[in-house]
Amino acid sequence: MSRPLSDQDKRKQISVRGLAGVENVSDLKKNFNRHLHFTLVKDRNVATPRDYYFALAHTVRDHLVDRWIRTQQHYYAKDPKRIYYLSLELYMGRTLQNTMVNLALENACDEATYQLGLDMEELEEIEEDAGLGNGGLGRLAACFLDSMATLGLAAYGYGIRYEFGIFNQKICGGWQMEEADDWLRYGNPWEKARPEFTLPVHFYGRVEHTSQGAKWVDTQVVLAMPYDTPVPGYRNNVVNTMRLWSAKAPPYFNLKDFNVGGYIQAVLDRNLAENISRVLYPNDKFFEGKELRLKQEYFVVAATLQDIIRRFKSSKFGCRDPVRTNFDAFPDKVAIQLNDTHPSLAIPELIRILVDLERLDWDKAWDVTVKTCAYTNHTVLPEALERWPVHLMETLLPRHLQIIYEINQRFLNRVAAAFPGDVDRLRRMSLVEEGAVKRINMAHLCIAGSHAVNGVARIHSEILKKTIFKDFYELEPHKFQNKTNGITPRRWLVLCNPGLAEVIAERIGEEYISDLDQLRKLLSYLDDQAFIRDVAKVKQENKLKFSAYLETEYKVHINPNSLFDVQVKRIHEYKRQLLNCLHIITLYNRIKREPNRFMVPRTIMIGGKAAPGYHMAKMIIKLITAIGDVVNHDPAVGDRFRVIFLENYRVSLAEKVIPAADLSEQISTAGTEASGTGNMKFMLNGALTIGTMDGANVEMAEEAGEDNFFIFGMRVEDVERLDQRGYNAQEYYDRIPELRQIIEQLSSGFFSPKQPDLFKDIVNMVMHHDRFKVFADYEEYIKCQDKVSELYKNPREWTRMVIRNIATSGKFSSDRTIAQYAREIWGLEPSRQRLPAPDEKI
């Protein structure tokens, strides 16, 4: 007779291996049905399209969850070094289709929904974008998480679960209006709340110094509750975690008020604590010293570091008891990557934990912190650099200010020893800036407290070393690296452009999807007529599809055979949407001058959001829409030319417009765009680039060959020389008749007859204080655009150039970027090894 099973043996039956996997269309249909009825509690008589989307999302999520659990089991068994990517922005977009692509479920789900009388594409369109970012910074973080999972790295993305993401943009009467992005109003099927890991975060209070050391006391506490979202790698059974923190008031919040009849007010006051995770600040290129923003930055850092240390101390899966108490191995097991300066408080916070709570001495705590942290810089614009007022830090985070002062003193002692007698250097390198308002320079804090500092394109990294961080480079040159940005080919080719992905796979197989350098094999097809024809056909199909979308969404009819000329990015003076406007007006004026002259038909599309408080950016949007009103309604223009402003540009719209674009506008003033990643997405999807030698454009032109790029304008050195000489817009105005005509039109109200002085601020800016020197590049830009039109007349040569660009875009995979971070900053070797599937033994 067999002995009775122990409780431990019985529990072994609770295993992910015991669950049947979803492997075929029949299983998918059953699970869809089960979720519709049992999870959503609906039947087909009352189910809405959104219910069907949720049922499909839950069905696909089932396929993720077993892999997610197994991945975490694997990490706890192997105890690898873990990567923690801290970012205040994580611009994920939609999840359903990306998950199906990475798990190889797309065809089966398509067939299952078809058999159920549903259209999968329509269901995909119901999903809200997770718009937890302003633009490139947050989208880069999302691409990086995808690549870290694909490369088998034990990585975690940490950020804030903003209740309201980047605002929805509405264009009313040509003006941008902002609407709240209530992306969670229907719920989010991809996240899992983890209330058991809720952590306290402290603010305000004061510091007591005792014989045992410093104590931060009398603080206000806010709780950080984590929500986990799975991040699947590409077909390797790895599913990593993105953990977003939501602010909650503690149950005893303002309890003292209860005794004096203030119960209702105390409950209402809970909102004040919970405001921390309420909304994303919609501005990442102008620093605003808002207390709530500083609270957000510390909130994510404090919760994340507690989580990291808990995980470091416990090495067994599910074990909450500390196993490690010694921090010598911390930098060997933990890498913290700071995505810009927003999470820079991780440096003083880690020191606070190690010194005040774990009782390490300062030198040991500093050594551990520096070896653990690394910093990525994303901007050279001085107005974007974070410089927090000391008085704000003193009130909100008094202990951290003391620690920053201590870091600064010790750091400046090192500088003084390395450069004796150079007093001005001490002033320039100090973490504390003296002035009318004393400030903490967060970039300086990051450089001092990290073992690696990287820019995000080769030219950007050189600018950092030669200009804004020159003093720091001279002190510690070994810290400075370059890591050129990249994009995930899963979302930015396979998902958004399946036709092109298939045409490529027919020639070189599918391995390129996780090894993008293999695209170079396409160079041998440059003269293959069938391949040229297939690439051109896919582009035309994408253009027809996007034209139909514009007609449905915007009620705008465009010519799908026209050249699709696209500039989509945040609206900012340095990105020079104004230069694009000057070209549009030039084309219009030429048509009016010579109405019978042949012109290559163009549809010029501009999209992007302006920060709500950025007056000039909002005026630029108004100008674009005003020009469109004139051009699109002028019978002399006809079908040759259209100007469209793409409202509410976001990840899901990018996935539609980028595959349809013929020409990608990357026209920032040389030396201002750190890298750019939109440029890479267009290149991979078969658009040619017109651009300046700025950011990653330089490396893209190098890869493709400058002959296969429409390069124009000043180089960085030219801009520097012009700055020294003094830029004078009047010179260009006097010398160039076409430019003069445009400025006269803007000044006289040609594009705003009801309000002739509407664009006076734009005219005043470009004529008298244009930091980004639009006029200086105008002539070359117009000539370069003429070359674009000339080449477009020759479809075969155009497509050959497109193929050359696609074939040489492999360098710009985020897999390459992350492999470099892993080897050169985190001290890890990426792995292409596939984890066992859930029904296999680990």
UniProtKB/Swiss-Prot annotation:
Its cofactor is pyridoxal 5'-phosphate. This is Glycogen phosphorylase, muscle form. AMP binds at D43, Y76, R310, R311, F312, K313, S314, S315, K316, F317, G318, C319. It comes from the Eukaryota. The modification Phosphoserine is found at S15, S26, S430, S514, S747, S748. Belongs to the glycogen phosphorylase family. It comes from Rattus norvegicus (Rat). The record marks C109, C143 as: Involved in the association of subunits. Keywords: Acetylation, Allosteric enzyme, Carbohydrate metabolism, Glycogen metabolism, Glycosyltransferase, Nucleotide-binding, Phosphoprotein, Pyridoxal phosphate, Transferase. Allosteric enzyme that catalyzes the rate-limiting step in glycogen catabolism, the phosphorolytic cleavage of glycogen to produce glucose-1-phosphate, and plays a central role in maintaining cellular and organismal glucose homeostasis. Allosterically regulated through the non-covalent binding of metabolites, being activated by AMP and inhibited by ATP, ADP, and glucose-6-phosphate. The activity is also controlled by post-translational modifications including phosphorylation. The modification Phosphotyrosine is found at Y204, Y227, Y473. Its EC number is 2.4.1.1. GO terms for biological process: glycogen catabolic process; glycogen metabolic process; intracellular calcium ion homeostasis; response to cAMP; response to hypoxia. It is an enzyme of class 2 (transferase). NCBIfam families: P_ylase. Phosphorylation of Ser-15 converts phosphorylase B (unphosphorylated) to phosphorylase A. The keyword Glycosyltransferase applies. GO terms for molecular function: AMP binding; carbohydrate binding; glycogen phosphorylase activity; pyridoxal phosphate binding.
